[in-house]
């Protein structure tokens, strides 16, 4: 059976301690995988079966394994073969690095190797490398993280396990009123109070930025179009940089006095334009709309 037939993708992440398993797990979570850390091998098949019967709630399961004994390794190998026989076709990722780099990483965090015991750090690394040699030889993808930064490792994992949708930047465009305080979760904040306030237009006061009357008024003001064009150009630059650095969630906040007129109209228009840009998924939030 293929992935289409089983309805679920399965990945197994293993490798040497200090080679980047935690980073890989976080990246897979960001890509939409359901990640389980250190699940006993005998329970992996059950976990996958539950995911397959979740009616689409879980479509991608990744199991991150911290292998510490020979029996554990052999059990994992058997489970992978069993999953393959059932048609799940698990993709095995193995992470490694040179002894010198692994030693340096352990020394930086001042931790011992899980197999070190009373011996030297290098002995623990050697024991683990030997213990995992068979699993490494059977892996679908081996990544040497010796010379990779965190961002470079994430990029390689995205290439191997991501989809077009999961690697796109998710942008939240939020309107707010300064009278109610700045949004704490905003990455970028812009002040829209340079535009005339529709509040002072009696026939517009009771409307808001979602209404056509207010929208046309705000977008028709001198400077509104220039602001949108220039801000969108800035976001292309900033968004590309954030994407290279592995940032997949971006919150843009536009504020006016009460968060009812100017910021709402501009947020809706900006979101519409950004939605047309390749690589961005956009949603709008009007934090203070409806507040007195």
Swiss-Prot record:
Indicate which residues the UniProt annotation says bind ATP. 15-22
Q: Look up keyword Ion transport and say if it applies.
A: no
Supply the alphabetized keyword list. ATP-binding, GTP-binding, Nucleotide-binding
Quote one Gene Ontology molecular function term.
Answer: GTP binding
Q: Which domain of life is it from?
A: Bacteria
Residues that, per the record, bind GTP: 66-69
What does the similarity note say?
A: Belongs to the RapZ-like family.
Function statement: Displays ATPase and GTPase activities.
Q: Could you tell me what this protein is called?
A: Nucleotide-binding protein SACE_2139
Which species is this UniProt entry from?
Saccharopolyspora erythraea (strain ATCC 11635 / DSM 40517 / JCM 4748 / NBRC 13426 / NCIMB 8594 / NRRL 2338)
